[in-house]
């Protein structure tokens, strides 16, 4: 992300996302009420009931920020607070897409915190990885990035029975097709890593073909009990895969969640969850790592949103680690039952000491 602070009070910043990961970073950083100046286009009347698409620069006070993973676009909407007078757009609603490479200027009345600016400036695309799970019944392929996982394919093998004379030939075709799809998606998403999972030797045959077709790709195999989407999710829980993909925050999040569950089974005093409780321990300087879903940052509940904002500022200012993940990611869905946010503590904090 390109970041330029344009005023001494750190109210105005100029930004340019340089990857899809940057777009997601914008999604979790922009807030309703921020004013965005951006070059966009809008239909305007030109007489005789006709309209024409005109390029213009608008200042928009945001009330909606939407990100759809793997589309390369972030959609922002709000009320126009400044625009060309001749088109009468002030006070009207406008929506536009922020794409990779788009420059935008963001104004925030209360200013930007040091932690927010640092997060934007240091945020780099962690890259992507493709993950496949294959057996004699199913083949699934997914792409994994810091902002989420997308299933690209989930198909049945439909192989003939073991006694069918054509089975060996059909298995070979199945392996060829699986390898081809992995190579195609690795190239399309510029993924340096491919993980191929499944039971038995079939995954090894696929991996060998992938490696021959794309020598620059780092290919790893991992044993799982099945193929298909269930096999992909099983692979993500393997420690060997976590090591390979440790740069991706969604996998890092799985590790934090597993550590949280391990700790809570032994001692409730070593972890915290829910926005209010996490804020209480953050004020004590007790938080080592906090994991939360992105939707909390834009919660319609003012108390929840303010508690989360303060907790994150405190944790980051005291050298703690903050991991923000999509609510619809595997780890994000599991976080819902804990109020959307959990924390690993540096030292035990008794329950009675956590009251705000």
Curated annotation (Swiss-Prot):
GO BP term (any one): ribosome disassembly
Q: Name one GO molecular function term.
A: metal ion binding
Q: Which InterPro entries match?
A: eFR1_2_sf, eRF1_1_Pelota, eRF1_3, Pelota/DOM34_N, Pelota_arc, Ribosomal_eL30-like_sf, Transl-rel_pelota
What top-tier enzyme class does this entry carry? hydrolase
Q: Which Pfam families does UniProt cross-reference here?
A: eRF1_1, eRF1_3
What is the E.C. number? 3.1.-.-
What cofactor is this protein dependent on? a divalent metal cation
A cellular component term, taken from the record's GO annotations = cytoplasm
**What keywords does the record list, in alphabetical order?**
Cytoplasm, Endonuclease, Hydrolase, Metal-binding, Nuclease
Q: Which Cys-Cys disulfides exist here? A: none
Superkingdom of this protein's organism: Archaea
Location(s), subcellular = Cytoplasm
Subunit-structure text: Monomer.
The UniProt similarity line reads: Belongs to the eukaryotic release factor 1 family. Pelota subfamily.
The text the record gives for the protein's domains is: The N-terminal domain has the RNA-binding Sm fold. It harbors the endoribonuclease activity.
Q: What does this protein do?
A: May function in recognizing stalled ribosomes, interact with stem-loop structures in stalled mRNA molecules, and effect endonucleolytic cleavage of the mRNA. May play a role in the release non-functional ribosomes and degradation of damaged mRNAs. Has endoribonuclease activity.
The name this protein carries in UniProt is Protein pelota homolog
Instruction: Provide the organism lineage as a comma list.
Output: Archaea, Thermoproteota, Thermoprotei, Desulfurococcales, Desulfurococcaceae
């Amino acid at each position: 992300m390109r970041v330029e602070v344009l005023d001494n009070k750190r109210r105005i910043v100029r930004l340019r996302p340089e990857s899809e990961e940057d777009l997601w970073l914008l999604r979790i950083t922009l807030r309703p009420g921020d004013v965005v100046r951006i070059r966009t286009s809008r239909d305007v009347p030109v007489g005789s009931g006709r309209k024409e698409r005109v390029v213009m620069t608008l200042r928009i006070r945001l009330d909606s920020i939407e990100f759809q993973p793997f589309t390369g676009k972030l959609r922002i909407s709000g009320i126009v607070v400044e625009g060309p007078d001749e088109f009468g757009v002030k006070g009207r609603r406008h929506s536009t897409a922020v794409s990779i490479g788009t420059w935008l200027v963001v104004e925030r009345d209360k200013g930007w915190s040091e932690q927010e600016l640092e997060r934007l400036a240091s945020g780099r695309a962690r890259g992507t990885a493709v993950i496949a799970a294959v057996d004699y019944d199913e083949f699934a392929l997914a792409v994994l990035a810091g902002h989420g996982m997308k299933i690209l394919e989930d198909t049945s093998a439909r192989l003939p029975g073991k006694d069918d004379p054509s089975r060996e030939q059909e298995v070979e075709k199945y392996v060829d097709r699986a390898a081809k799809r992995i190579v195609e998606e690795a190239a399309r998403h510029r993924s340096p890593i491919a993980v191929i999972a499944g039971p038995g030797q079939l995954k090894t045959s696929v991996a060998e073909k992938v490696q021959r077709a794309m020598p620059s790709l780092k290919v790893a195999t991992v044993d799982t009990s099945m193929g298909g989407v269930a096999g992909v999710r099983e692979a993500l829980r393997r420690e060997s895969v976590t090591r390979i993909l440790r740069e991706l925050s969604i996998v890092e999040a799985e590790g934090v969640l597993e550590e949280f569950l391990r700790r809570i089974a032994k001692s409730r005093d070593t972890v915290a969850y829910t926005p209010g409780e996490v804020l209480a321990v953050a004020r004590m300087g007790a938080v080592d790592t906090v994991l939360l879903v992105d939707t909390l940052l834009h919660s319609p509940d003012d108390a929840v949103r303010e508690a989360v904002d303060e907790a994150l500022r405190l944790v980051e200012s005291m050298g703690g680690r903050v991991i923000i993940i999509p609510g619809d990611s595997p780890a994000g869905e599991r976080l819902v039952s804990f109020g959307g946010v959990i924390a690993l503590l540096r030292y035990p904090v008794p329950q009675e000491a956590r009251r705000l």
